[in-house]
């Protein structure tokens, strides 16, 4: 009888702890049919949720269209200022539908996070470097210099890592916030596989925009950084609907 009682208590204890664990959720976006799958990540400094994939053009284009629409210029998207049009095709001909958005500056990435926050009931941001590293657990495939055929690839077309997150390494590098300002982490389709991961941390340089013929050069787009993309995080969990 005592053994059965101990077993019953163990079952109850396990059942009671489950509700405290962060769970995955789908982020809907007001005024669109698009959703973002958000993956929970447990951290000693506080749980957070990270987008399962890099942000695709499908959603980034909605942001651009909304920001640049004449009907919304005065609205300002709740004080979010949008990027100016890019010179040339910012997708470089790699692909649009299902492909990661590329070439945006840190300023544009932060503006996108602000816009998404204004369309949801959560605050979104670029990950800190610490958050990115915690989410960069083992496993998962990667698009890199030797298998990418010199192009980005559609999101979620390799194996996810052990948390269920796609393309943390490779495909496109991703903006993170560091003590020294925004940087791009993780490596991209232009790097060899051994260079993918947190060791590849790039500081924006003038060379990323040297062929932009506009003067002044765009603060929103990089004419020569087709390897830059983004994903977002939030600390507002699945119950914050």
Regions found by a protein language model. Give the residues of each.
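Active-site microenvironments of metalloenzymes and redox enzymes
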Residues: 47-139, 234-240
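Glycine-centered tight beta-turn/hairpin loop motif at sheet-sheet or coil-to-beta transitions
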Residues: 31-36, 45-47, 150
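Outer-membrane beta-barrel "beta-signal"
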Residues: 229-231
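Sec-dependent signal peptide recognition
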Residues: 2-8
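C-terminal motif of bacterial Sec signal peptides marking the signal peptidase cleavage site
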Residues: 14-15
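Functional-site microenvironments in short loops/helix caps that host divalent-cation chemistry
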Residues: 29, 95-212, 217-226
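GGW-centered surface loops in extracellular recognition modules
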Residues: 23-39
């Amino acid at each position: 009888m005592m053994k059965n009682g101990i077993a019953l208590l163990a079952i109850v204890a396990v059942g009671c702890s489950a509700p405290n664990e962060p769970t995955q959720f789908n982020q809907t976006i007001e005024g669109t049919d698009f959703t973002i799958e958000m993956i929970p990540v447990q951290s000693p400094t506080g749980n957070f949720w990270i987008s399962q994939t890099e942000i695709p053009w499908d959603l980034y284009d909605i942001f651009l269209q909304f920001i640049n629409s004449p009907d919304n210029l005065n609205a300002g998207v709740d004080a979010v200022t949008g990027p100016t049009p890019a010179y040339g095709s910012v997708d470089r001909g790699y692909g649009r539908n299902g492909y990661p958005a590329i070439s945006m500056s840190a300023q544009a990435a932060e503006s996108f996070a602000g816009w998404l926050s204004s369309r949801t009931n959560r605050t979104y941001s670029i990950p800190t470097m610490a958050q990115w590293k915690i989410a960069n657990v083992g496993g998962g495939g990667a698009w890199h210099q030797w298998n990418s055929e010199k192009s980005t690839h559609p999101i979620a077309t390799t194996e996810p890592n052990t948390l269920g997150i796609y393309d943390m390494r490779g495909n496109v590098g991703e903006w993170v916030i560091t003590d020294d300002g925004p940087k791009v982490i993780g490596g991209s389709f232009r790097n060899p596989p051994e260079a993918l991961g947190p060791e590849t941390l790039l500081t924006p340089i003038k060379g990323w925009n040297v062929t932009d013929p506009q003067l002044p050069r765009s603060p929103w787009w990089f004419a020569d950084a087709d390897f830059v993309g983004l994903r977002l995080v939030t600390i507002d969990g699945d119950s914050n609907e």
